[in-house]
Amino acid sequence: MARYLGPKCKLSRREGCDLLLKSGVRDHKSKCKSEKLPGQHGDKKPRLNSYGIQLREKQKIRRLYGILEKQFRNYYKKAARQKGSTGENLMALLERRLDNVVYRMGFASTRAEARQLVAHKAILVNDKVVNVPSFLVNPGDTVSVRQKAKNQGRIQAALALSEQRAPCDWITVDTGSFKGTFSTAPTLMDLSSDYNVNLVVELYSK
């Protein structure tokens, strides 16, 4: 699948916040020193109408999870077909992605690194190899690192970095055995308040 391979800081600057696209070895300000928007006229912040605000919010969430537009729209369509709040369903689907779960458990320092671990067959789901980053983890599923991958330096470093992040209530992790359990899909109350998924629903429902 195609992926964005350009500068990560450029995306964070565009959205005006840290999208967690780089490891947490250094803080966001030292990694992305410029706070201006990318481009020739980055020092001039444009005025956004309602559509522009909705679009920026969609781009922020899409880039946070490292998903291209077509796949993101498909997640929205699936969320809209499910019972309950479309916004909450959408975020639950994104959080259930295997690459995201691997990142949340601390086995990778970024979602991009988690995606690579999954693609390289370093991750097990219920003791079976799964190499599809978009695989949807179900409540009660266990996710672990394969035995031969446990000594990888990047996984050890990621686990150390993960101690600086706030724990996720919907995930339990045993770092000693490189294993975790996805207890339940999170609600909007569990997730960051840095984005408003309802704006995405408004954008796509037009």
UniProtKB/Swiss-Prot annotation:
GO cellular component, one term: small ribosomal subunit
GO MF assignments: rRNA binding; structural constituent of ribosome
GO biological process: ribosomal small subunit biogenesis; translation
Domain S4 RNA-binding residue range list: 96-161
Assigned keywords, A-Z: Ribonucleoprotein, Ribosomal protein, RNA-binding, rRNA-binding
HAMAP family xrefs: Ribosomal_uS4_B (MF_01306_B)
Similarity comment: family membership: Belongs to the universal ribosomal protein uS4 family.
Assembly behavior: Part of the 30S ribosomal subunit. Contacts protein S5. The interaction surface between S4 and S5 is involved in control of translational fidelity.
Known function: One of the primary rRNA binding proteins, it binds directly to 16S rRNA where it nucleates assembly of the body of the 30S subunit. With S5 and S12 plays an important role in translational accuracy.
Name listed for the protein in its UniProt record: Small ribosomal subunit protein uS4
Biological source species: Legionella pneumophila subsp. pneumophila (strain Philadelphia 1 / ATCC 33152 / DSM 7513)
